[in-house]
Amino acid sequence: MTQSILSNLNHPNDIKNLSYSDLKYLAHEIRQRIIEVLSVNGGHLASNLGVVELTLALHKVFESPDDKFIWDVSHQTYVHKLLTGRNDRFHEIRQFKGLCGFSHPKESIHDHFHAGHAGTALSLALGVAKNRDLTKRKDYIIPIIGDATLTCGLTLEALNNISRELKRFIVILNDNAMSISKNVGAITHILSRLLSNPTTNKIHQELDTIVSKIPNYGPILSQQGHKITESLKNLVSPAVYFEQYGLSYIGPIDGHDTKKLVDVLEGVKDSNWPVIIHVLTRKGEGMDEAIKNPISYHGAKPFSKDTGKFLPNPVTKPTFPKIFGSHLLKMAEKDPSIVAITPAMSAGSCLDDFMKTFPERCIDVGIAESHAITFAGGMAYGGKMKIVASIYATFLQRAFDNVFHDICLQELPVVFAIDRAGISGPDGSTHHGIYDISFLNAMPNMIIAQPRNGQVLKELMESAFSWKRPTAIRYPNLMTEEFNHPICERELGKGEVLIEGTEILIVALGHMNQAALKVRDLLAQTGIEATVLDPIFVKPLDSELFCKLLLNHNKIVTIEEHSVVSGMGSIINNFLVGQGFNQIQVLNLGIPEAFLDHGRNQDLLNEIGLVPEKIFRQIQSHFNLIAQNTLNPVA
């Protein structure tokens, strides 16, 4: 049995003297370690299996942390973590108080940014390189970007800002979808210069004119000549594309050949200009199931490490996104004016069936959130189409100005289906959807609503187009009750009293009503009968209902899985002041003004006090309540 190499690695320098046969065995060990841990924890599997040799080559050639690897999105840094002293904690990845699933500077000096959103690496790297040059340092800056990153406007802006004089700047294009031409060799470089040369183009045009005049065969020869030229252009397009930005293009290179990668990286270290190395990798390399289905194994759920098959999921209820996706499809089958738009999240947002059924009415614009929102505004212009922009809450942050300038200011009736609203568990602080109410509430004309269950979600979806205003319907990725009752029209801005009592009014947003009802039961055991109100609408608030309830309630508790800063609680506080309810005592509960870490949702909620027992205790403490009987319902 071969002795483990991985278990004896303490620093990335430890791999520099390994033979290529040892590196091959280490790559095998790394893949087995990733598969073993993620079979239990879940996580970004396919992309990490695909970058093993690339990461080994980078650490073999460069000196981390002095030389800086800046990973775009950084969900593919598991191998990097294993090589930089975190193997002993790798079993904790994405777990509460464990390793982050993305790069994180607080975790290691080898991680330079806490990333999680796409398209940022190149801009960050250029900034780091400028800092290096101004401070007269000589370290290498190596941004690692994916092929999908090239759809990001931010990446294109950064490309446009690259200087030809920039040295020790090496961009790695990790192409795991082979979406860019994979033709290779010196001929690519030669033809790129030849076909982009104005003189060559002029000669081609003149020859085409002469050939086309040949009797009988002229048009055929001319047509074939055009086909050959277009083929050659496709052959060389990567070089032509990147070199116009000042980057010297090399590749494509086999991303699973460690020696070839090392040779190329060593060869460009002394380049006098910025370089981009096009590396072809395969998502899921080393695991058959992940290779066959890289989308499902991108963010994999727990699976059998022996067979690779996903473990049975004892799901008894649908999730909010599944209800959204299936109901939107039903609506679209009845109404041909409904169009869905998504920025590269059709699978996560459960729009795949919609896309298969109505491909012309489900538009995936790629990782381009700003464009997605403004594009939605353009489609909504004129009022003949009903536009649903489906987007994760954390990614909507990237399109703040587009929502303001291109939707709300224009008074366009786009419906925002805001997925992953609330805590996003193992993905952590880069992905929690806990700020959208804060910035959307500042937008004039905007409607903000959140359903407590699948039935209310469907009713909001059915009603939203009739309001003819920008509308945000936010919901978490959690299981919920669907009910399938007849769908009633939702009146704009109207809430619902779930249980009526006196003295304490508990206002809970969306799925937090489940916790609110449990809190009410705990309060009831101490002699207090509270009212539970589901406002449904954060904007506009049901002012009539609030004013009525406040006649016999002198305490309000707001509960939301959102930042307490400018969230629902703040909105209600402003309402109370504006209406003159100055004697009302208020307790606002939500996510504190801090970056919330990663872990299971329940662990995170418990830590910040948003579970029923802790909410109950906070209510008792804040309002100085004295139990009216001796029952202590909480241990």
Swiss-Prot record:
It comes from the Bacteria. InterPro entries: Dxylulose-5-P_synthase, THDP-binding, Transketo_C/PFOR_II, Transketolase-like_Pyr-bd, Transketolase_C, Transketolase_CS. Binds 1 Mg(2+) ion per subunit. Binds 1 thiamine pyrophosphate per subunit. It catalyses: D-glyceraldehyde 3-phosphate + pyruvate + H(+) = 1-deoxy-D-xylulose 5-phosphate + CO2. Pathway: Metabolic intermediate biosynthesis; 1-deoxy-D-xylulose 5-phosphate biosynthesis; 1-deoxy-D-xylulose 5-phosphate from D-glyceraldehyde 3-phosphate and pyruvate: step 1/1. It is an enzyme of class 2 (transferase). Mg(2+) binds at residues 147, 176. This is 1-deoxy-D-xylulose-5-phosphate synthase. It comes from Protochlamydia amoebophila (strain UWE25). The lineage of its organism: Bacteria, Pseudomonadati, Chlamydiota, Chlamydiia, Parachlamydiales. The gene is dxs.
